[in-house]
From Swiss-Prot:
It comes from Vipera renardi (Steppe viper). CDD domains: PLA2c. Residues 1-16 form the signal peptide. This is Acidic phospholipase A2 Vur-PL3. Belongs to the phospholipase A2 family. Group II subfamily. D49 sub-subfamily. Its main location: secreted. SMART domains: PA2c (SM00085). Binds 1 Ca(2+) ion. The keyword Lipid metabolism applies. It is found in: Secreted.
Length: 137
């Protein structure tokens, strides 16, 4: 399933939300979203189950929960406006749906940046068979 997420990112190109989220991640971490965060732990990438394995994986868990609270929107596809300003990410939409999606992505990118030093390569391409006890949002 994570492969599908990677393919989706490539197909969306510059118009999709996942591309925008990737740019935010790169801005806050210096890392490629596709290479570093698309298949990490139990929650980074398509889907998610189990217990977050570390602070980075918890960022993805919280992001998934945030997307789950955005009703009536398409968080992985809707395009929103944002800018980078003095080291921060500023969401700029008046549309409540687009703003909520942007804020979810912004919070996750900031979380990745705050936890970049705890990123552990052992969780990259982590087998979902290790992701058993599911946490609730």
């Amino acid at each position: 399933m994570r492969t599908l997420w990677i393919v989706a990112v490539c197909l969306i190109g510059v118009e999709g939300n996942l591309f925008q989220f990737g740019k935010m991640i790169k801005y806050k971490t210096g890392k490629s979203a596709l290479l570093s965060y698309s298949a990490y732990g139990c929650y980074c990438g398509w889907g998610g189950q189990g217990k977050p394995q570390d602070p980075t994986d918890r960022c993805c868990f919280v992001h998934d929960c945030c997307y789950g609270r955005v009703n009536g929107c398409n968080p992985k596809m809707d395009t929103y406006s944002y800018s980078f300003l003095n080291g921060d990410i500023v969401c700029g939409d008046d549309d409540p749906c687009l703003r909520a999606i942007c804020e979810c992505d912004r919070a996750a990118a900031i979380c990745f940046g705050e936890n970049v030093n705890t990123y552990d390569k052992k969780y990259k391409y982590y087998s979902s068979s290790h992701c058993t006890e599911t946490e609730q949002c």
